[in-house]
Regions:
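Transmembrane alpha-helices and adjacent helix-loop boundaries
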Residues: 1-333, 337
Length: 338
C-alpha cells in the first residue's frame, strides 16, 4: 500500500483551501465588477465611491440578521431576520443610496457625480467609525451568521459557500446579459457614446442613467451583504477606497468595459495578483518581503498602465452592436431591375 507523503498532502490541502477561498472571494468581487460595468462600461457613469454601496449593503444585512447587541456591543437593530432577507435588504439599501446620490447629481456634468460618490464614501465610513451606538464604531460587527452554516460540517462549508457564491454570480451575470442585450441596454450604450444624440432621438437620458445607477448600486449592495456573511465580521477600516473601489475599477479596465464576460475575467486576473501576491512573501528578498502589501498595490498599478498602453480595450473587447435593420441593408443584395 502506497502512503502519500505528508508534506505533499499538507501542501495539496492547503492549496485546495486557498483556491476555494480565492474563488469564493473573486465571485463576490466579480458581482461588484459587473455592477460597475453596468454603470461605467454601458452607461458612462463615473462611480468612484463603489465602496460606499458595498459597505451599506454589508452593514444593512449584518444589522438585520445579528442578534440583539450584548452589553459589550453598541449597535442598532439586531433583529435576527433570515439571511435571505438580509441579502435583499442589502441590495435595497445600495439601490436607495444610489437614488439619493443620483437625484441631485445625475442632471449635472458627469464629473460632479464622480466627486459626489467619493465624498459619500468618506462620509459613510466616518459615520460608521465615530458615531456611538450605531454600528459599534471601529470595533465593527462580529458573529455575523453564515448562510446554511448549521446544515453542513466545518470542512464541507467552504465548498457550500463557493457553490452559493457561484450561483449568485451566475444569476447576476445572466440577468445583466439579458437586460443589456435588450433595447434598454442599447439606449444605455447610446447615452454613453453620445448623450446629446440619444436625447435628440427622444430618449429621457437622465431617467435611463438613473435606472442604471440605481440597479448598479443595488447589485453592489447585494455583493456587500454576501461579503458580510462570508467573512462573519466587518469593520469600517476594512472598507477602504483602495480595496473597495480602486481594485474593482482595475478589474473592469483589465477585463474590458462594456462586456460582462470581461468583468468576470478581469476579477479573476486582478484578484489573482491582489490576493496571491502575499503568498510569495517568504520567497522575496527581505526588502520586498516586508513590503509585500505595497508590492501588490504596485503590481495592480502596473497592470493598469500596461493595459492602457498595450490593450486599452481590455482582455475582451466590447462587441459592436448593429441593429438588424442596418445589417439587412448592408448584406442583402438588391433585386435586379427588370
Amino acid at each position: 500500500m502506497i502512503t502519500p507523503d505528508p508534506i505533499i498532502l499538507v501542501t495539496f490541502i492547503g492549496a485546495t483551501n486557498w483556491g476555494v477561498g480565492f474563488l469564493t472571494t473573486v465571485a463576490i468581487f466579480a458581482i461588484v465588477a459587473l455592477a460597475l460595468n453596468l454603470q461605467w462600461g454601458y452607461t458612462g457613469i463615473f462611480n468612484f465611491g463603489v465602496v460606499a454601496f458595498f459597505m451599506v449593503g454589508a452593514y444593512t444585512s449584518a444589522l438585520l440578521t445579528l442578534p440583539p447587541p450584548s452589553k459589550f456591543e453598541s449597535h442598532i437593530l439586531g433583529l435576527e431576520l433570515p439571511i435571505l432577507m438580509g441579502w435583499f435588504a442589502g441590495a435595497l439599501a445600495g439601490g436607495l443610496l444610489a437614488l439619493i446620490i443620483g437625484l441631485p447629481t445625475l442632471r449635472l456634468r458627469r464629473d460632479f457625480l464622480a466627486i459626489a460618490t467619493i465624498g459619500v464614501a468618506t462620509i459613510i465610513r466616518s459615520i460608521a467609525n465615530t458615531t456611538e451606538g450605531f454600528v459599534n464604531r471601529g470595533s465593527g460587527l462580529n458573529g455575523i451568521p453564515r448562510f446554511l452554516n448549521d446544515f453542513t460540517s466545518a470542512s464541507d462549508y467552504k465548498w457550500v459557500l463557493l457553490v452559493i457564491m457561484l450561483i449568485m454570480l451566475s444569476a447576476v451575470y445572466f440577468g445583466l446579459q439579458r437586460v443589456t442585450a435588450a433595447p434598454w441596454g442599447r439606449v444605455l450604450r447610446a447615452i454613453r457614446d453620445n448623450e446629446d444624440t440619444a436625447m435628440a432621438a427622444g430618449k429621457h437620458t437622465v431617467s435611463f442613467r438613473m435606472q442604471a445607477f440605481v440597479l448598479g448600486g443595488a447589485i453592489m449592495g447585494l455583493a456587500g451583504a454576501l461579503w458580510a456573511h462570508r467573512t462573519g465580521s466587518i469593520s469600517p477600516t476594512a472598507f477602504n477606497d483602495l480595496f473597495g473601489t480602486f481594485v474593482i475599477w482595475t478589474m473592469v479596465m483589465v477585463g474590458g468595459s462594456g462586456n460582462n464576460k470581461g468583468a468576470i475575467i478581469g476579477a479573476l486576473v486582478v484578484g489573482f495578483f491582489w490576493f496571491g501576491t502575499p503568498l510569495i512573501q517568504e520567497d522575496l528578498p527581505d526588502f520586498l518581503g516586508t513590503r509585500v502589501f505595497q508590492l501588490r498595490e504596485l503590481t495592480v498599478g502596473l497592470l493598469i498602465v500596461l493595459f492602457l498602453l498595450l490593450q486599452p480595450h481590455g482582455l475582451i473587447r466590447e462587441k459592436a452592436q448593429v441593429s438588424r435593420f442596418i445589417t439587412c441593408l448592408l448584406y442583402t443584395s438588391p433585386s435586379p431591375r427588370d
